[in-house]
Regions:
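Extracytoplasmic
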Residues: 48-50, 71-73, 81, 100-102, ...
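Active-site SXXK
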Residues: 77-105, 274
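Short, glycine/proline-biased beta-turn/loop segments that scaffold the active-site neighborhood
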Residues: 96-122
Length: 318
């Protein structure tokens, strides 16, 4: 559960870190954090279930990062949020010469799942390229595309190994679509933590996992994601760049993103890596989407990310 003690300890740490760096406005930031707990508690009460959040900033230097966390080490079903990482692995394999993105992957009617808008539309062709499948999996969350890609990366076990190689000891992949969306209580299969997913985003976007052109392609796919227009994207000001991947299934509604804020002059700032996972409760889809949008707004409004985080400060409501 959310803890006032945890948030206030985070506020003190935030103020101390800002003071140590000679930053002004510490009192303002502490007051902002002090109000955070009530607003977040209200959001979780509206949800009627469990909410996990991890937000991280910084340009790859672990000593120059700020974070906000709410139940960020608890496990949640990742559902389709994993598809951005699946596309990352395919791009890495292409960078390493193991595959070509224009390689045609054959499939038939037996491979088509209920939710497969792009692969169904291309079924007459009988194949799609790896690049086309990645685009389908990320931008429209096509489940058949994801399964065809999983087969190319060594299945769930191969994708788990990839995550381990990126330093993630938490995220695991056990099944293919649609079974991975079962979201059963106390079932560790096909789960992640908000902290693990946010760090994966940061590792990929600020590291050397992908060559520059491949990273640009991943960003383009995620910026083009059409399934999350009412979630994280709805919680940030118009004009900010958002690259995200959503996921939902059996009471879980999730969104993970890289967000590039803009200052008052319109200049793009350092990215924020954000993972929001929810499960449980009885809200409908529209209300669940609003929970994620409101949580996103709270992340950026209450803490003052652009000015403060990224200065080795952290705020935790664990």
């Amino acid at each position: 559960m959310l803890s006032r003690r945890g948030v206030m300890a985070g506020a003190a740490a935030l103020a101390a870190g800002a003071a140590g760096l000679g930053l002004g406005g510490c009192t303002r930031e502490v007051k902002a954090v002090a109000g955070f707990i009530g607003r977040m508690t209200a959001i979780q009460q509206r949800l009627g279930g469990r909410l996990g959040v991890y937000a991280l900033t910084g340009n790859g230097d672990h000593t120059a990062s700020g974070s906000l966390s709410i139940q960020s080490t608890e496990r949640f079903a990742h559902c389709s949020t994993f598809k951005w990482l699946l596309a990352t692995r395919v791009l890495q394999m292409a960078d390493q010469g193991q595959v070509r993105l224009d390689k045609a992957i054959a499939y038939g009617k037996a491979d088509l799942l209920d939710y497969a808008p792009v692969t169904k539309a291309n079924a007459v062709r009988g194949h799609m390229t790896l690049s086309e499948l990645c685009a389908a999996a990320v931008t429209l969350s096509d489940n058949t595309a994801a399964n065809l890609l999983l087969a190319q990366v060594g299945g769930p076990a191969g994708l788990t190994q990839f995550a381990r190689g990126l330093g993630d000891s938490e995220t695991r992949f056990d099944r293919a679509e649609p079974d991975l969306n079962s979201n059963q209580a106390n079932d560790p299969r096909d789960t992640t933590t908000p902290a693990a997913m946010a760090w994966l985003l940061k590792t990929v976007y600020t590291g050397t996992v992908l060559k520059p052109d491949s990273l640009a392609q991943l960003k383009a796919w995620m910026v083009g994601c059409q399934t999350g227009l009412k979630e994280i994207r709805a919680g940030v000001p118009a004009g900010w760049t958002v690259a995200d991947k959503t996921g939902r299934g059996n009471g879980a509604v999730n969104d993970v993103a890289v967000v590039w804020p803009k200052d008052k002059t319109g200049k793009e700032q350092a990215p924020v890596f954000l993972a929001i996972y929810t499960t449980g409760g009885t809200l409908g889809d529209d209300d669940r989407n609003q929970i994620i949008a409101d949580t996103t707004r709270l992340v950026f409004d209450s803490i003052g990310f652009v000015e403060t985080l990224g200065q080795s400060a952290s705020v935790s409501a664990e």
